[in-house]
C-alpha cells in the first residue's frame, strides 16, 4: 500500500512540475496590442521620463553594428534593454527602440547605405533569464518607427546578414524556442525586403542556429 501511495505521489508531482509549453505567438501579439492600448490610454502618457543611468546593472550587451565608413558611429544591442546609437564613439548614446513593441534584442544589422536597421528580437544567450522575442523588426527611419517583418514564433534570432549589393536580400538565423520544440527555427532568406521568407536550412524541431556568416566575395 505504501509503495502504491508513493508511486501515485511521484506521478502527481511529475505532472504538477512538468515543463510549461511556450507561449504561442498569437497570445504574445494580443498582449502587445493590449500594452499599446494601455499606453495610449495612460493618464501619464505625456509626462517626460529621464534616464537615470545604470543603477543596479547595465544589462548584457549582445551585439554591435559599426559603420564601416565612420567607425565612431555604431549601434549597441542589449539583451533586455533595446538598441542604442552613438555617433561620437560612445561618449553619448540615444535609445532608438523606445517606440518598438519589445526591448529584447538578439542581434542587429544595419544597411549603412540607406540607414535601414534590422533587429532580431529575443536574447540568444540561453538561460532561465533569457526573454523571448517577437520576430524580426525593421526600421527605415533610423528607429522612429518599427515594422514586424515576421518569424514571430522563432522566439530568439541570432544572426542577420544583409547582401551589400542588394539590401532587399537578407539571411536570418533563428534559434527557436529554448526549452521546447518548434518548427520556426533554422536559416531563412528573403529577397523582397522581408515581405516573404523561405526556409533554406532546417535540421529538426530541436536544433537552432547560433551564428551564420557569408563569403564576402559571394553572398549566396
Q: Could you tell me what each predicted segment is?
A:
Residues 1-22:
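Bacterial Sec-dependent N-terminal signal peptides
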Residues 19-220:
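Beta-propeller blade termini and top-face loops
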Amino acid at each position: 500500500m505504501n509503495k502504491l501511495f508513493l508511486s501515485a505521489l511521484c506521478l502527481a508531482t511529475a505532472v504538477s512540475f512538468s515543463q510549461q509549453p511556450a507561449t504561442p505567438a498569437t497570445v504574445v501579439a494580443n498582449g502587445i496590442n493590449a500594452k499599446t492600448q494601455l499606453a495610449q490610454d495612460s493618464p501619464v502618457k505625456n509626462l517626460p521620463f529621464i534616464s537615470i543611468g545604470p543603477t543596479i546593472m547595465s544589462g548584457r550587451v549582445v551585439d554591435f553594428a559599426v559603420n564601416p565608413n565612420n567607425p565612431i558611429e555604431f549601434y549597441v544591442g542589449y539583451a533586455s534593454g533595446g538598441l542604442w546609437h552613438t555617433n561620437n564613439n560612445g561618449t553619448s548614446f540615444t535609445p532608438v527602440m523606445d517606440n518598438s513593441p519589445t526591448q529584447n534584442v538578439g542581434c542587429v544589422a544595419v544597411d549603412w547605405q540607406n540607414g535601414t536597421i534590422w533587429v532580431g528580437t529575443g536574447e540568444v544567450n540561453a538561460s532561465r533569464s533569457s526573454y523571448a522575442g517577437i520576430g524580426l523588426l525593421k526600421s527605415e527611419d533610423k528607429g522612429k518607427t518599427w515594422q514586424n517583418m515576421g518569424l514571430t514564433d522563432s522566439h530568439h534570432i541570432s544572426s542577420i546578414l544583409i547582401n551589400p549589393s542588394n539590401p532587399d536580400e537578407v539571411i536570418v538565423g533563428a534559434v527557436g524556442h529554448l526549452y521546447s520544440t518548434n518548427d520556426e527555427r533554422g536559416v531563412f532568406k528573403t529577397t523582397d525586403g522581408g515581405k516573404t521568407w523561405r526556409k533554406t536550412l532546417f535540421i529538426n524541431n530541436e536544433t537552432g542556429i547560433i551564428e551564420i556568416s557569408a563569403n564576402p566575395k559571394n553572398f549566396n
